Amino acid sequence: DSVKSRGLGDVYKRQGLWRRNGIPPQKLTGVGFSAQGQFTGSYYLRKNYDKDFDWVFRGINENKIGNFGFSGGGAAGFELDRADYKLGTPENCKILASSEGHDNDYVLVPEEHLTHLTTVPGDPLKSLLRADMVYFENSNGGKVFSTGSITFCGSLPHNNFNNNVSTLLSNILNKFSK
């Protein structure tokens, strides 16, 4: 669990998951690794209908976002990251969309299990099997967008980039460039 650094003196650095080292990824990106499955993908459903975030979904008329793709057949799959305010997701971080409809082979990662029946956050197991798409701005004006899924990029080129995942990402990047 600890590794001795090379050089003068005895300096030990703890290795392993950021979460166990006191710096969970939720603090940096808004989301952290929560579940994993076979190389299959699912879709996102919009969760945030606040008018302040309509710009993210401009040009998207479908309810399901990313129910297609070259990586597992969907934008949300393989590894799923979710927001967790208890682990450091910033309070101003908004969950824009969450995935659902994952195959039964998806399981929580070990650090989410308290026992074989309960989870660390105390939430029902199925509710943690999701990818969250999040957005927030930090105190220095930086903007953060996280997809919460490793297969998101595989949905971008679907239909020659003429799809709701590409539209959504274009909306985000246009906002970032202003």
Task: Mark where each language-model region is.
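Catalytic grooves of carbohydrate-active enzymes
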Residues: 140-141, 148-154
